[in-house]
Amino acid sequence: MKIPLLLQNKKKLLKIMGLFFLLMIISFFLLRNTVLNWAIDKVATKFKNKYHGEFSVQHAVFSGISAIALQDICLTSPAKDTLLNIEQLDANIKILPLLLAHIRLDEVFIDSTNIAIFKTAKKDNISFLLKSNKQEKKDSIDKRKGNIDIGNLAYNFVKTIFDVIPQKVQVLSTSIELQRDTAYFKTTIDTVSFIDGHFHCNINTVESKGKSLYILNGDVNKDERTLNFSLYPHQIKEQTSFPILKSFLNLSISFDTLFVALNHTDYDSDILQLEGKALIKKGALNHWRISPKDIALDYAEVNYKFNVGVAELSLDSSTSIKLNKMLIKPYIHYQHSPKKTLAFDFKIPKMDAQEFFVSLPTGLFQNLEGIQAKGELGFNMHFFMDTEVPDSVEFVCAMPKNKFKITSYGEARLSKLNEEFLYTAFERGHPIRSFLVGPSNPNYNALANISPYLQNALMTSEDGNFYWHNGFNENAFRKSIAENYKKGRFARGGSTISMQLVKNVFLTRNKTIARKVEEALIVWLIESNRIASKERMYEVYLNIIEWGPGIYGAGEASAYYFNKKAADLTLAESIYLAMIVPRPKWFKYNFDETGKLKPHVADFYRIIANHLVRKEIITEEQKLALLPDITLAGPAKELILIKDTLGVDSLNLPELDLMLESD
């Protein structure tokens, strides 16, 4: 008898639930306009309390079973300046998801949208949104720190984006206006259409830097969670700059075609995988931090795969990049917990050497343009750091080659190191003096005519392994990375004498990313192909480095400080000259008002002397007899007696032992 009773109770329960559900639906239809306006008022009140601005909808009503019509939607700042205005927004809401408290739109129609954002000295209608929520965001981040599942968070974000995309969208007459100080941008979009997974729009832009018209086409598959789009200028020959970037970031990007695709989305075993493709044709880029000239690239293609885990992000090793004919295989892995680690691998498999150089973007490495080579050339770099043990950092860099040979040097004329040439010294980016590096210059000194004490003291201080490395001191570079990370700032460099020489002789003084990479490439070309001997490189270096105000080379320095020839420098004088190379214009701060070296200098003398003893350059007796005591006899003597108006007591150099490279 119990079973029929249970069935009867179950039927009653189902009837009650059905009735309750029906009442909810009826109540919703009867009260839907009231509920809609109540919800809008609640949003408006919350916005006003939080940001002191105003959110309003002039007219809001349900029309039909599931259609909402909103008119005159407005968002204003506390100063009553309008950020957003939409004259009309009609949307069809899917009923079933709505009953489950999920808003899913079926169709959307928007007409006459105006967005105006200003941040100038006289007008600012956006800062109130950015400032009000700072502490709340910080508290939220602090609360969740260490407990965020990055993979799940990213997956839910991607899933939500695809879920909320309506089946059909039509947007008419959109205007977006942005201004920050003197930078100005305005775009108008007549029509945006999205029907059956395909979207299209024309984008007209007006900037302080010019006008442009772009066409955007693409497809979205909500079920598969894939998408792709193409963006290209209306008239390809115009090579117009991509909107906004030029005005606000001083970054100019132009192209014939930009294509981006997300081809696969998968979430399995707590890892989100995103795979896709991006390519650009006839691209050009310009930014003063990258290169002083336009960087041009005929073709670039990326086939990417991102992995996002619970506490890690990675660019998968299956990712490939193609620059013209060059294939690049990158790998990046960042782990947030239980400890922070960063791994980076960058590989260019060996390829035809001429195609290697031709594939480099023009304008990026100006000195390498026109270079001719044969054989094969590649590139490998590996980096790994465990932030808990920064001293264990791994860094390996190499350019494997096969029968590689330079047949023509192109723009750089790297072989000029073996000849007499005109050198121009720069200060703060401006040329201040030019002189010949060679026998025609009376201040020039061959290596044999420069004191061995100076040669070895300077090499010990600047690059102790100069004669044994191939232009790059990986051990010094690893120490530099670790030291800079531990101190949280740039505290130690890793440049070798070869790198300093190339920077001074071949490159501009523009501090750009391209210059640093070009510096490394030229160093490798010179060192690995023996374009100039180590002895010749060091000889040129000793004759061009700055050693004081307007003083260049060992010949001028020995006369300026000691009124003697470079060959006659003593051990104490040589160590002093080696010490001031990092900051030659500060030399006078090493002396007190009596003309004697200050006590702190003794540490540098001791460290250099110990290294020279180990290298058997000097004897133990010479070290014991060495005193940090020199007598200025040249024009420099007149400067040290001038009272120090800056109030500097000592030379603010990095820790002395960090200036020295290990043997």
List the model feature ranges, each with a label.
Residues 59-177, 195-230, 265-266, 271-272, ...:
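Flexible beta-edge/linker motif
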Residues 53-57, 91, 373:
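Generic structural motif
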Residues 10-11, 15-76:
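N-terminal amphipathic/hydrophobic interface segments
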Residues 1-11:
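N-terminal Lys/Arg-rich, disordered targeting/topogenic segments
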Residues 42, 105, 153-166, 185-200, ...:
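Juxtamembrane regions of bacterial inner-membrane/periplasmic proteins
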